[in-house]
């Protein structure tokens, strides 16, 4: 009798072990089977080391990459291929955030019931939100300079342009050892760069909401070209003379913003970098942007002043700054970006700034264009912008231009960075104009 009991217990233990193992396998199968299916050793979906199923289109239906043949067939135009290389990707997965890498499971068409089987055997189509013609315009506008252009619809979240340079031809990719630095990075998504004066839009938001309105209205600063804090010189490009809050932003006066940063304080500046989404990573159909990083030393007024100007240890992700531009355009809330044209609905961000703050920033950004950049340089565009000239050790400044246009049919925010170049409005501004003119006027 005892033997039977022992055998029953042993069988029960074995059954529990079997059930536990089976449960663990089912759990992992449900959770991870999509990644198992798209491993390189799966000959059903890979051929000669590259994906052998699925096609990638842009938002207008232009075929960007066809994986279904013996080799990957890309769009015919070389410039278009290079303008969209980091967005579309290549057969070898050099760009981890590209469609060929990030949307591999969609291209394969995997699901739990049928696996990778499809009636056609050709996988699925993926339609990106980018417009390849806009990307080509951005690529040509950047020329041979390193940089990036990002444009998105601040009402729907659709990213219509994300172009990075230097780039490569996915039909004939270079050896990774010989490629220029940044070639295989989508800088719009994965980059972190010193922002320079475009960060003053964050400092301005903090000033509006943290400094009493009566004091901010009376704010005045006499710029002589050099402002000293604790024996350290903070320089401007020129002596701006007497400036108020609005004038300080229009003239991008470092001295004035150093003083504003001191009044706001390190803790509040840090809080607003977070509130404005600059330390946020957004889920864009499964692709995540890099987080920006910022330091605001509590007991170091000099470093806090530099940080509020957009220097010191400020490192900005362009995608997150673009979303903040959307918040200013949208009365304080923005829309999470999307990389797929087929992605329906919209996901709003949390409120970044008050609606009244957004309205005031819009007014100030419009004043920037009128007073400093020249509306005639952006003909036909109702543009709101801030330039930036970020000092980078060992090279010329990085030129920035960020903002949005107010147009019922074309509600787009933009960000441009031209590395190792010069002044923001003089270098990055014309790039933004060329891209926006093409979007609005097709020319």
PLM region spans:
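Beta-lactam-recognizing serine transpeptidase/beta-lactamase-like catalytic domain environment
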Residues: 60, 155-196, 202-424, 441-443
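Periplasmic/cell-envelope proteins involved in peptidoglycan metabolism and beta-lactam response
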Residues: 1-176, 183, 192, 267-275, ...
């Amino acid at each position: 009798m005892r033997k039977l009991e022992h055998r029953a217990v042993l069988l029960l233990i074995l059954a529990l072990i079997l059930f536990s193992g089976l449960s663990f396998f089912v759990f992992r199968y449900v959770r991870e089977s999509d990644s198992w299916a798209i491993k390189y050793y799966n000959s059903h979906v890979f051929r000669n080391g590259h994906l052998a199923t699925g096609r990638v289109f842009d938002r207008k239906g232009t075929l960007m990459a066809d994986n279904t043949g013996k080799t990957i067939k890309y769009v015919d135009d070389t410039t278009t291929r290079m303008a969209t290389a980091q967005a579309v990707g290549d057969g070898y997965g050099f760009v981890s955030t590209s469609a060929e890498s990030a949307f591999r499971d969609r291209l394969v068409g995997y699901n739990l019931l049928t696996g990778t089987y499809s009636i056609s055997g050709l996988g699925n189509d993926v339609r990106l939100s980018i417009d390849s013609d806009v990307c080509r315009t951005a690529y040509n506008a950047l020329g041979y300079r390193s940089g990036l252009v990002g444009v998105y619809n601040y009402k729907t979240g659709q990213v219509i342009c994300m172009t990075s340079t230097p780039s490569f031809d996915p039909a004939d990719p270079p050896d990774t050892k010989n490629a220029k630095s940044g070639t295989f990075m989508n800088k719009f998504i994965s980059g972190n760069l010193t922002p320079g004066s475009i960060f003053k839009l964050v400092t301005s938001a903090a000033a509006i909401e943290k400094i009493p309105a009566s004091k901010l209205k009376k704010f005045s600063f006499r710029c002589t070209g050099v402002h000293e804090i604790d024996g350290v010189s903070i320089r401007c490009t020129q002596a701006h003379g007497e400036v108020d809050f609005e004038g300080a932003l229009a003239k991008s006066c470092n001295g004035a913003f150093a003083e504003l940063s001191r009044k706001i304080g390190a803790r509040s500046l840090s809080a607003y970098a977070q509130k404005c989404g600059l330390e946020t990573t957004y889920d864009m159909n499964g692709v995540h942007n890099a987080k920006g990083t910022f330091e605001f030393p509590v007991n170091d007024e000099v470093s806090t002043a530099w940080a509020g100007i957009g220097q010191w240890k400020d490192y900005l992700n362009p995608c997150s700054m673009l979303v903040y531009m959307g918040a200013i355009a949208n009365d304080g809330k923005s829309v999470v970006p999307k990389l797929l044209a087929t992605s329906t609905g919209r996901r709003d961000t949390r409120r970044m700034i008050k609606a009244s703050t957004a309205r005031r920033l819009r007014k100030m950004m419009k004043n920037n264009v009128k007073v400093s950049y020249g509306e005639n340089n952006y003909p036909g565009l109702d543009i709101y912008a801030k330039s930036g000239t970020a000092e980078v050790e060992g090279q010329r400044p990085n030129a920035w231009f960020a903002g949005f246009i107010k147009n019922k049919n074309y509600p787009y925010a933009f960000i441009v960075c031209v590395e190792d170049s010069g002044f923001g409005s003089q270098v990055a501004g014309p790039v933004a104009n060329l891209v926006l003119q093409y979007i609005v006027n097709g020319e």
